[in-house]
Amino acid sequence: MPIRTVMKANEAAAWAAKLAKPKVIAAFPITPSTLVPEKISEFVANGELDAEFIKVESEHSAISAVVGASAAGVRTFTATASQGLALMHEVLFIAAGMRLPIVMAIGNRSLSAPINIWNDWQDSISQRDTGWIQFYAENNQEALDLILLAYKVAEDERVLLPAMVGFDAFILTHTVEPVEIPDQEVVDEFLGEYEPKHAYLDPKRPITQGTLAFPAHYMEAKYLVWDAMEKARKVIDEAFAEFEKRFGRKYQKIEEYKTDDAEIIFVTMGSLAGTLKDWVDKKREEGYKVGAAKMTVYRPFPVEEIRALAKKAKVLGFIEKDISIGLYGAVFIDASAALVNESERPLMLDFIAGLGGRDVTFGQLDDALRIAEEALEKGEVEKPIHWIGLRKELL
Amino acid sequence: AESPFKADIERAQKELTEKMTPGAIAYIPGSSVINKTGSWRVFKPEFHKDKCVRCFLCYIYCPEPAIYLDEEGYPVFDYDYCKGCGICANECPTKAIEMVREVK
């Protein structure tokens, strides 16, 4: 029987890692993710998890150590956040380019400067071009489940790409919620033993990994990484379906909420989806035709799902905790690209919110709604990007 | 003396015509031999057999290795891979190896 208990998302991530039975874990402590490797080291020390726990001197070394272990042919795990993930940046490309199905938990935290330990998604959003699959969890149960799903998708022969699972700093990492720990046997059946066909070391089969590719070969290697990420779309759907069958919890790349007759739909990710759905309930009672959508998968970008969602809305608003300085929020930019060749598109708005841990309140969502309604009334968008919840008195 | 890499070069050249693998893994060991690094050379080791005492130091120190020994134990320089680092000339106790500017 699955155990129903209460825990923080960091603990849920550690439990997910334990259930997946990685052979090597390397990690370096960083707020708000420290508890993940701390808990795992406890599992290893207690003999509950048979794995090598490598203590390293930086996040760059942590990811490098798991790249080495994964290239040797075992299942691996690590966790980090913010500056730590930024320090891993160059090695993230290497993990993807070497097609190593590493899984990493991210306690989504802002980037310096100014230094700030609280939640936004800038750390992992900024890794969107590295070739890592990206999942975002709404709650602690999703943090656990999505890590198991990350292994399932990453290790699929059609994919073979690393995957990261993001969950919001403090809002989830340090908040205790009810979580169901699945049975080990069911997880074992779901994931199976990790048996790499390409990336493993065996003296009887000498190979070179991490090769040099001249201009005559580099593009093809990169194309295969891009192509694998394209193929991941279908594999993710299959994995979600199998997960639901085995564990009874349903996941979708984009989960819609009260969208069927909605004129205005807001899209978000992570824990903000909970706030948004609550707010939609309230606005529905007040007579507004609003809906919500939660993006669980950010890479590969859910192009088809965004197109289907766009068909339902007259105004599509993105509420995101990240900003691509020099343009708009990354989710809005990507969604715009997904819709660019559609003959009919909704009016589109981008709302930058909650950076550096600022609470996203109903009042701020009301502001976004007012801007969306104004666009709907006028039939055009004058300004696509709005920062909501800004303290104008400080500017 | 024939390059000991001849068979590797032939196998690796065959691999080059095969498909790109996931992770750009090279499945044939020794495939780096098809990259003729001798073209990087600025100075070339010139061998003076009359001074050579067959101590093998050049053969031992060559980091490539681009020096192998003929049947009599004299060094043979593989200019396909010798990058002209000059370590052999530096180590040679009888100055039997002289670095001369490469002329192309």
Curated annotation (Swiss-Prot), chain A:
Signal peptide: none annotated. Pfam families: PFOR_II, POR_N. It comes from the Archaea. SUPFAM superfamilies: Thiamin diphosphate-binding fold (THDP-binding), TK C-terminal domain-like. This is Pyruvate synthase subunit PorA. Heterotetramer of one alpha, one beta, one delta and one gamma chain. Keywords: Oxidoreductase. InterPro entries: PFOR_II (IPR033412), Pyruvate:ferred/Flavod_OxRd (IPR050722), Pyruvate_synthase_PorA (IPR053390), Pyrv_Fd/Flavodoxin_OxRdtase_N (IPR002880), THDP-binding (IPR029061), Transketo_C/PFOR_II (IPR009014).
